[in-house]
Amino acid sequence: MSLKHFIQITKPGIIFGNVLSVAGGFFLASKGHVDLAVFLAAMIGTSLVVASGCVFNNCIDRDIDLKMERTKNRVLVQGLISLKLALVYATVLGVAGVALLYKVANPLAALFAVIGFIIYVGFYSLYLKRKSVHGTLVGSLSGAMPPVIGYVAVTNSFDMAALTLLVMFSLWQMPHSYAIAIFRFNDYLAASIPVLPVKRGIQVAKKHILIYILAFLVATLMLTFSGYAGMSYLAVAAAMGMYWLYMAWTGYKAVDDTVWARKLFVFSIFTITALSVMMSLDFKVPTELLLTYAP
């Protein structure tokens, strides 16, 4: 048991990806007026809650992880940290994260963190991941919470922009997750996880991927059409979304589904990262605010 093991079970890669989306939502809402304390609380608080969820997930998935090539050497599977200690660790992380969001940001940000946690740990990890082909869809809601947390940490309200972020990031999760399930098909099959590609076939999954990416593309454009983001954001969102859609379309003629799915997965990360960055840089300041600060 070492510090490295405690870091590993929080899944740092997942935390980093979520932190980027928190920042995107935060800066979109801030519109150039950043409260540093609230920003740090949103980033650190969300990171702690996500880390907590990941540790709980590691605890719950020990039996599944043992059957999968990719996960059979994880810390808890190998017994490098005891289950009891991991559960205490996860609880401390979660409580600290929610408390930080509640005290420094606002109760609404803390509420969305709790909702995301409950969906991920309670509904997805404990039950739906193992029992339902729709587990990915329900789990996608938890993955969409970080940008919403970042946004409401500033606004303290759930408006159209927050709803758009929730829809955007939920829709993004679906093709992203299905792509993983395709190139890790044998792992999911061995662990009897009923993801769509395993349960209903890769060809059916390809159709769903195409539909979800199309819906995601439309949702991303709504930030500009609703007056929350600028034209530079729109250009990047349209370009990334259309190319991702094209990549999905090429899946119907793919010679090797594993290679195709891996490329689709990698581009999904580039896409959501680019949008998070553009939301941070190309927010749209309302006309009334511009008039307020006019000389």
UniProtKB/Swiss-Prot annotation:
One of its GO terms (cellular component) is plasma membrane. The keyword Chaperone does not apply. One of its GO terms (molecular function) is protoheme IX farnesyltransferase activity. InterPro entries: Protohaem_IX_farnesylTrfase, UbiA_prenyltransferase, UbiA_prenylTrfase_CS, UbiA_sf. The keyword Transferase applies. Its EC number is 2.5.1.141. It is found in: Cell inner membrane. It is a multi-pass membrane protein. GO terms for biological process: heme O biosynthetic process. Pathway: Porphyrin-containing compound metabolism; heme O biosynthesis; heme O from protoheme: step 1/1. It is an enzyme of class 2 (transferase). The chain crosses the membrane at residues 9-29, 36-56, 80-100, 108-128, 135-155, 163-183, 209-229, 230-250, 265-285. Keywords: Cell inner membrane, Cell membrane, Heme biosynthesis, Membrane, Transferase, Transmembrane, Transmembrane helix. Carbon 2 of the heme B porphyrin ring is defined according to the Fischer nomenclature. Belongs to the UbiA prenyltransferase family. Protoheme IX farnesyltransferase subfamily. NCBIfam families: cyoE_ctaB, PRK04375.1-1. HAMAP family: CyoE_CtaB (MF_00154). Converts heme B (protoheme IX) to heme O by substitution of the vinyl group on carbon 2 of heme B porphyrin ring with a hydroxyethyl farnesyl side group. This is Protoheme IX farnesyltransferase 2.
